[in-house]
Amino acid sequence: STPYFKELERQYGFFRVYETGWPKADTYFSPETQLRPRNDRPVILYPPTFTRNVCSAPHLMKEIELLAKTKPWDWIITFHPKLTDPDIIAGYKRIAAENDNVTFFEGPDKMPLLQRADAMLCDSSSIILEFMFLDKPVVTFRNSHPGPHLIDVDRPEKVGPALERALSRPEELMREIRAYTMHHEPHRDCRCSARVLDAVDDYIARGHAGLKRKPLNLIRKWKLRRQMRYYPLLEMFRR
């Protein structure tokens, strides 16, 4: 995305663009994080999104329960804090309580789960990209933007065969995953956070030298003030 914003920088001239990379990605590309898991049995991570119209949790409950009983896999199920449907939560907690190979994880730190899992089952959650940063395959249920980097299915009964394929890590799929993640984050040196700080220091040191004056944008400012009901001058006169 940097070339696009660099062109805007050249066109408008009142701001600077720095290419830094995504600071959060530093965690995913450290040597310790990139280590492949050593599990006795395949581990499937299921972290569905909370967005109601694309959330797979209501549709896959029965299928996940069936797979937990019939496949030699271990499962880790974890929900976003905003997924609050009590029936869905109770249903998956019941599956975990009745099956020794299923864990229902409640906690904010998902990184250990991403590291431990061999494959992910998901829908359209943003965590998919983070998991693929670890060079691991993802099966999705009715993903909103499917592509060759995903194994996307549209019916619950297709989940099992799709996970078996994912666990085999076919070379074509892994190539697509690597190309996709490289497009989204080419910086793999774990210095994205440092580049952000360097950019801030550089801007402070250079100040506004060489930049044009920012347009007043009075109409936009008025719309924002009206939207936020922010009228400091009127408040002064009222006093």
How would you describe each model-predicted region?
Residues 13-15, 72-73, 135-137:
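A short helix->loop->beta-strand "cap" motif at the edges of active sites that frequently abuts
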Residues 1-26:
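Active-site-proximal region of nucleotide-activated glycan assembly enzymes
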Residues 161, 167-239:
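C-terminal amphipathic helix plus adjacent low-complexity
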Residues 18-93, 153, 188, 192-194:
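Conserved catalytic-core segment of nucleotide-activated headgroup transferases in glycan assembly
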Residues 89-106:
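Nucleotide-activated donor-binding/catalytic signature segment of Leloir-type glycosyltransferases, i.e.
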Residues 17, 101-103, 150-151:
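Short, conserved active-site loop motifs that form the nucleotide-linked donor/cofactor pocket
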Residues 107-150:
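A donor-sugar binding/catalytic signature common to diverse glycosyltransferases
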